[in-house]
Amino acid sequence: SMHGAEAPPGFEQMRLVLLQHGGLASLTGKTGLAMLRHRQGPIVAVVDPDHAGQSLQQITGIDRDVPVVADLPAAMAFAPEVAVIGLAPSGGRLPDHVRRDVLAALRSGLHLASGLHTQLAEDPELASARCADRWIWDLRREPAGVGVAQARAAQLECHRLLAVGTDMAVGKMSACLALLEAAELRSRPARFVGTGQAGILISGEGVALDAVRVDYAAGAVEAAVLRAAAGLPRDGLVLVEGQGSLCHPASTATLPLLRGTQPTALLLVHRAGQSTIERMPQIPLPDLRDLVPT
């Protein structure tokens, strides 16, 4: 089995089926929705019994033509090679109805990629269902050899842009990937550092920040930024996906991202019209003019 934020060889071009149970029309499915928006390699089917047979474009507004099916056996008609868990369930555990299709995928000879906190390769039932030359990639793992941060990114010559958000799930990653595409169109050298499960699944590398022990979190970000910056010229751009939120009371990720990136610029991402933290109406969002000192 594989673990850590480096994708298995060939992953970028492999044929994926996304396990999106109940997550095509909700934030629970944001990992899979992000892959549908931004993955360049093939996605051949989406499993969501709630929307089986419907048009992906009509359900999600995403301009990609992928069949939506009821279960894993139905997805096998489209010859997938890898099953990817496209859900970010609360608490990071594998729900039972998804587990059924994960087992079916492994027994059908597919590889499995998961960004859940639960390490699926260590699950005895799943491990024994896996075929001999297939992998289970648990990407939400602390990288090997993490150390403490030393502000080393401050010595880099290239630009370092860190996305920060007024709330969670406001589009920090999507904004970075849009900038990456824009930079490529202008032949501006740019690299993306994924820091969450979707960013890692899309780019094939990065650091799963919320799997890193807090003392090493800034150091893990620093190491990823230094890797991304290697060989970039002065006008090069390192785009670091933000995590958590500047204003959310549960968010711890902001500080290690600032420390590890030593950013030359911050990209503030906000959901237009939002005035309080999602599901916490008692916490108002500050005026954007107060958040950005002029």
Model feature map: region roles:
Residues 118-125, 137-139, 143, 151, ...:
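Conserved catalytic-core segment of NTP-binding enzymes
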Residues 180-218:
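N-terminal phosphate/diphosphate-binding loop that engages ATP/GTP or pyrophosphate donors
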